[in-house]
Amino acid sequence: MPGSKSPRGMFAARKLELKRKKFRWSDLEYKRRILQLKKKVDPLEGAPQARGIVVEKVGIESRQPNSAVRKCVRVQLLKNGKVVTAFLPGDGALLFVNEHDEVVIEGIGGPEGRAYGDLPGVRWKVIKVNGVSLKEILRGRKQKPTR
């Protein structure tokens, strides 16, 4: 068997398995998953949702070919103090969110946990304001409590 770099004998399974395991580390997705690199850089630290305080309201310009100012807020997370930008979904949502309000944010649902649509660098969206669903406030079913 000249030229073969792999063991080809009858009892070579263990050796072949070890060799495969060694080569898996060149696969970027495998390496990121095993070393939990996503969790280490994620401001939410792997959690599906997080609470935070609104620091400021910001308008973010959408990417080409669209032209709009998307209403967002800068949120400081309570668990670690990191500041992230979160999108305010819904018509007139900015009117119901003020600075120093407590909000709950979650992922915006972009590909591979990244930004969504024409919003550059925005990975999260606001779902609750002062403990009440933003969707219910916008529909007029519930009122935003004053803190």
Swiss-Prot record:
<dbReference type="GO" id="GO:0019843">
    <property type="term" value="F:rRNA binding"/>
</dbReference>
<dbReference type="InterPro" id="IPR005679">
    <property type="entry name" value="Ribosomal_uS12_bac"/>
</dbReference>
<keyword id="KW-0689">Ribosomal protein</keyword>
<dbReference type="GO" id="GO:0003735">
    <property type="term" value="F:structural constituent of ribosome"/>
</dbReference>
<protein>
    <recommendedName>
        <fullName>Small ribosomal subunit protein uS12</fullName>
    </recommendedName>
</protein>
<dbReference type="InterPro" id="IPR012340">
    <property type="entry name" value="NA-bd_OB-fold"/>
</dbReference>
<dbReference type="Pfam" id="PF00164">
    <property type="entry name" value="Ribosom_S12_S23"/>
</dbReference>
<keyword id="KW-0699">rRNA-binding</keyword>
<dbReference type="InterPro" id="IPR006032">
    <property type="entry name" value="Ribosomal_uS12"/>
</dbReference>
<keyword id="KW-0694">RNA-binding</keyword>
<dbReference type="GO" id="GO:0015935">
    <property type="term" value="C:small ribosomal subunit"/>
</dbReference>
<dbReference type="InterPro" id="IPR022863">
    <property type="entry name" value="Ribosomal_uS12_arc"/>
</dbReference>
<comment type="function">
    <text>With S4 and S5 plays an important role in translational accuracy. Located at the interface of the 30S and 50S subunits.</text>
</comment>
<dbReference type="InterPro" id="IPR005680">
    <property type="entry name" value="Ribosomal_uS12_euk/arc"/>
</dbReference>
<comment type="similarity">
    <text>Belongs to the universal ribosomal protein uS12 family.</text>
</comment>
<keyword id="KW-0687">Ribonucleoprotein</keyword>
<dbReference type="GO" id="GO:0006412">
    <property type="term" value="P:translation"/>
</dbReference>
<comment type="subunit">
    <text>Part of the 30S ribosomal subunit.</text>
</comment>
